[in-house]
Each structure stands twice: as C-alpha cells, then as structure tokens.
Amino acid sequence: MDSSEMGPDSWMKIVHAIAEHYHDYDGFVVLHGTDTMAFTASALSFMLENLSKPVILTGSQLPIGMLRTDGKENLITAIEIAAARENDMPLVPEVCIFFENDLLRGNRTSKTNADNFNAFRSYNYPPLAHAGISIKYDIPQIYHPVSRKPLKPHYLLDRNIAILKIFPGISPQVVESILNIPGLKGVVMETFGSGNAPGYDWLLEMLKDAVERGIVIVNVTQCLAGSVEMHRYETGRKLLQAGVVSGYDSTTECAVAKLMFLFGHGMTPDEVKEHLNCSLIGEITIA
C-alpha cells in the first residue's frame, strides 16, 4: 500500500497486530512509506496506551531494491534499536521513527524533505539516539512509563477533523466552507509565527461561532520550530478570546491524531480542550 493511502483503518490494523503479539516479542519494527509516516507514528503513540516496548517506524526514500537505497541501513538499525535492552528493560519504550541515523520521537516528527535521505526532523524535541559506529542513546530524553500497567490498545478514532491553514488574503468563503463541514468536531488551525492570524472581524466571528457550536479549534504554528504563544501579540490574544485553544509546540500531524483520539473516546469539547492542555505521551512541551 502506498503510504498516501494510509489512515485510521490502517493504524487500527497495526495496533491490533502489535497487541496480538505483544507478549511474543521484545520490540516491533513497522515498515512504512515516508509520506504519512509521521501521522501514523503520532496516532500509534496515543493508541498504544501504557506501551512499555519499542515500536520503531522506518522506511526509505529509495526503494530497497535499488543499489543506493537507504532502506537497508534504516531497517537493520531499527531492528537493533527495537531489540536494545539495559538491565533487562527496553532502552526505548515508545513509538519512534528511525531515519538516516537519527531516532526521533514519533509524535514530534514531521517529514521535511522529499528528495534527501534525511527526510524527517523533530525541531522541537531532540533526537533520542544517533547511530554512527555505535548507537548513542540520550537516555534523559526517552519517555519511560510511570508504571508498568498492561498495554491498553485503542481502536476508536473520530475522523471529523479538518485542517485550516491561514494565509494572506484568505477569504470568508474558504473559512466558512471548512467550519461548516457537516459533523465537524475539531479543527487544527495552522497560523503564522507564534500563533497569529489576521484580525479580520469576520474571521474572529466565524471562529467564535464555531467554538460556540462545540467545535474545538487548536492553534499550531506553520513554522517548523517554535511554539504557539497566543498571549504574545494582539492578533494571538484575539484568537484566544474567540475560544481557540493553544497547541503549544505540537506538529500538525500530532494535533490531528490527538483530536481523532480524544473525540474517538466520546469526550465532550470541554474534556478535549482539557486534554489538549496537557502532554499525554510527551507530544508537547508546556512551560
């Protein structure tokens, strides 16, 4: 399957396969196309609650049958990381992406290059490990579960989520068409800089109306690095007053997956907002 066709149904199959064989293996490697790998990694991080074993996603920019493929090294190292243990405990008990020598937290990662082997970056969180002659792990950065509870797989996701990308000259018709999608529950709004958008009266009114109708709007920055701080500028404060929720330093991929996960649990809009304001599995940084 081309990864462009991956989505919630595929994520559920992966979760089911891991849950079914969870006690048979020390770790898991998921081979995945690069285009939507960050979406899948983000979703799996929420869907595999109480995960205590490595789940490493990897793939290649060049098909593995080609002479210069990056796939062989990515696969071999991903397997080594998935099997790595210290004091009889997994070294990396979380969902990660391994690509071009770097191990990255899955829900912090985005695909940032379509042509180079270093296709993935995690700008707001440091790599968990770097592979050279040896693999050097940054242990303090690795997420470790607080307690050893049994794995709790989740299969319910709500797809009534949309992405609204703000751009100069955006029209009322564009915003209205998105905010009035039948059944819409959540919107990931990509804004400028530290969470800013034009202060158009019509835009603020549309956002406020959507929030009052129970639609959760989470604000993430279009920048590759940095965090949303809606208190910093007047334009951001107006979004806050309209009821828009901060996404902090979340990636768009993670924000989409998190909304699908939270609404999939039947949460009310207020409950979803409450969970957006906390880090569930190391996906955001809250100062």
Language-model features: locations:
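ATP/NTP phosphate-donor binding region
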Residues: 1-19, 205
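Short beta-strand segments
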Residues: 30-32, 56-59, 93-100, 165, ...
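Gly/Ser/Thr-rich loops at beta-strand to alpha-helix junctions
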Residues: 32-38, 103, 193-196, 225
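Short Gly/Thr/Asp-enriched flexible loops that form oxyanion-binding sites at enzyme active sites
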Residues: 30-53, 199-206
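Short coil/turn connectors at secondary-structure junctions
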Residues: 23-27, 50-54, 90-94, 100, ...
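C-terminal non-catalytic interaction/assembly regions of soluble proteins
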Residues: 191-287
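Internal gly/pro-rich beta-alpha loop/helix module
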Residues: 57-132
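Accessory alpha-helical/coil subdomains and C-terminal extensions
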Residues: 105-189, 194, 199-200, 279-287
